[in-house]
């Protein structure tokens, strides 16, 4: 009698059933490269150590984001949340630099690729890494306001309220707290500024993005906001001059 035995150890990072599902995909895995046409050179970006690469939407940026979940694979099984190390990848040379370890979120590149932005669940704060200074700076903190979902009722870290978007040339990032919009400086030179006054009346303001292809906000424009009073349930629209 032939017996099929599946041998698996508790020390393995992934469950055996997950390994079986991933096996075929891993056999067919491809790695992102860049072909520089003018110099006829192919530059590998993804590797077995950093297999995941994310490009800016227009795919014309000098930087790309690299990820690896392998050191934290067991967390996906136990927590249901993917942890990852974040890398900045030089599209010209393929050189990579590890920015931060053990992230639980999905970072993004700013429109002008001057910064890498992410939300830190444990700190409940926004962070940005500067390509120019090679430094990480917090954009918000809980002393100013709560930028995380205060009514989170699950046994996990709360999510961010989100962001309205970047200003032109990555000059600032506008983020949300429970009610208001805040203008933050990714260089840390200027303190965050509250742009609306929703807290006093418990009115929530959110930016209405009328053009989904807009990459940034201009400093001289007027934003259309949606307003919702959490006490009276009245809603409407407002204008905000940047």
Show which residues each predicted segment covers:
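Beta-propeller folds
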Residues: 1-242
């Amino acid at each position: 009698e032939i017996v099929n035995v599946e041998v698996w150890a508790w020390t393995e990072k992934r469950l055996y059933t997950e390994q079986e599902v991933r096996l075929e995909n891993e056999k067919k895995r491809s790695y992102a490269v860049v072909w520089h046409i003018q110099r006829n050179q192919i530059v590998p970006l993804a590797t077995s150590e950093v297999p995941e690469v994310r490009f800016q939407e227009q795919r014309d940026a000098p930087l790309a984001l690299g990820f690896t979940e392998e050191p934290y694979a067991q967390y996906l099984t136990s927590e249901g949340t993917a942890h990852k190390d974040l890398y900045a990848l030089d599209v010209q040379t393929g050189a990579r630099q590890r920015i931060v370890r053990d992230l639980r979120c999905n970072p993004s590149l700013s429109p002008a690729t001057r910064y890498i932005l992410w939300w830190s669940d444990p700190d409940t704060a926004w962070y940005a890494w500067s390509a120019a200074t090679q430094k990480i700076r917090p954009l918000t903190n809980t002393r100013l306001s709560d930028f995380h979902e205060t009514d989170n009722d699950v046994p996990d870290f709360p999510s961010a309220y989100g962001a309205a978007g970047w200003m032109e040339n990555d000059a600032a990032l506008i983020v949300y707290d429970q009610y208001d919009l805040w203008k933050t400086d990714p260089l840390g030179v200027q303190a965050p500024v509250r742009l609306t006054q929703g807290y006093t009346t418990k009115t929530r303001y959110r930016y209405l993005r009328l053009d989904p292809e807009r990459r940034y906000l201009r400093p001289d424009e007027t934003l259309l906001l949606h307003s919702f009073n959490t006490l009276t349930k009245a809603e409407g629209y407002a204008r905000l001059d940047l």
